[in-house]
C-alpha cells in the first residue's frame, strides 16, 4: 500500500504550513528581539523536528537549538497521560536563556504543561511554548500554548513530522489518516 492510499484527506497543505510557519516566526522574532537573553528553541523529538527546522530558518534573531525526547503515547493513538522524559536537556545553566519549547501538536496539554514545570524547576528563567497544531477539544489540563499555528478538529493527523507508529512523518502536508489504518472502523472514528 502506498502512503497516498492511507490518507483520507489533506487538512493543511504545504503552502499553508509555510504561511503558518512564517507568521509564527515573525511573532517570535518581534517578541524576543529586545531580550537580553539568548533564545533557545527546544525541539521536542521526534515529532517537532521538521517544524523546528523550518521555523528556525525564518526567525531573524540569533538563537540556539536544543532537543529533548519526551513520550506520552507509547504504541497507542491516545496519550497515556504519563509523561516520560527519555532524553533530557543537556544544558546546565538555564537562567541566562529564554526557552521556547517547540511542539508539533498539543492534545491533552499534559506534555507541555509538565515539560514547562520541569524546565522551571531546573532553573529556567523563562519558558514559553509554540505548537504548530492545537486540539483544544482534547485538553485534560488547563494549558494554552503561547504561540499556536492552527487550531484543528479532533482528527488523527499525520505528516510534516507527525506520525502513526513511526510512519508518515515524511509527508510534506498534514493529512487525516484513514481510520482503518490505525485500527478503527469508520463508526468508531466518529
Predicted regions, residues:
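PRPP-associated nucleotide enzymes
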Residues: 1-190
